[in-house]
Regions:
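Carbohydrate-active catalytic/glycan-binding domains of CAZyme proteins
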Residues: 1-170
Length: 170
């Protein structure tokens, strides 16, 4: 569809979310009084292309009915080419509570999961930051910090097949 659901509290869901740039698989962080949104566009793997892009952009609100609702121009933070061993999709964001550093994981089961550092003030990739391969054979990763430990969660299996889906969290 053209949009989706949005929630201010993670429990109450509202219809009418705007999907900027027709992107997919977004992740959102609140940084100060703004929201940093990361999403991806892709050519699709599985016989298609591995050409993908992860972008970030800012908004003051996630409520599409607010007069303050306006995304900034998207900034590319990761890309993948047709013959690459990673598909730049499925961004996951983490603001490290111990250091204030901002991280973005991305990738799909067609190759590696990669990690890059972003500037928490701009949402841009830190200059000179090389992508680090951190996992393989999973997708839709997210990063968590709990009680002194860092976790990389991902999904493994097949999706989008109703009751025949085998997706599980690893």
């Amino acid at each position: 569809g053209e949009g989706g659901l949005w929630s201010a509290d993670g429990w109450t869901w509202n219809r009418g979310a705007v999907r900027p740039g027709r992107g997919a698989a977004p992740d959102v962080l609140t940084l100060g009084d703004r929201y940093l949104v990361a999403y991806s566009t892709t050519g699709g793997g599985l016989g298609g292309t591995h050409k993908g892009t992860v972008v970030t952009m800012w908004n003051k609100t996630l409520d599409p009915n607010s007069p303050d609702f306006k995304y900034t121009e998207p900034v590319v933070v990761a890309e993948s080419a047709d013959d690459e061993d990673c598909d730049a999709i499925d961004a996951g964001l983490l603001l490290d509570p111990t250091t204030g550093r901002l991280w973005c994981s991305y990738g799909t089961y067609f190759g590696f999961i990669r990690l890059v550092e972003l500037d928490p003030k701009t949402g841009k990739r830190m200059e000179g930051n090389e992508a680090l391969n951190v996992a393989i054979d999973c997708e839709a990763t997210d990063l968590l910090y709990r009680n002194g430990w860092y976790y990389l969660l991902g999904t493994h299996g097949t999706c989008c097949d109703g009751v025949n889906s085998t997706y599980n969290i690893v």
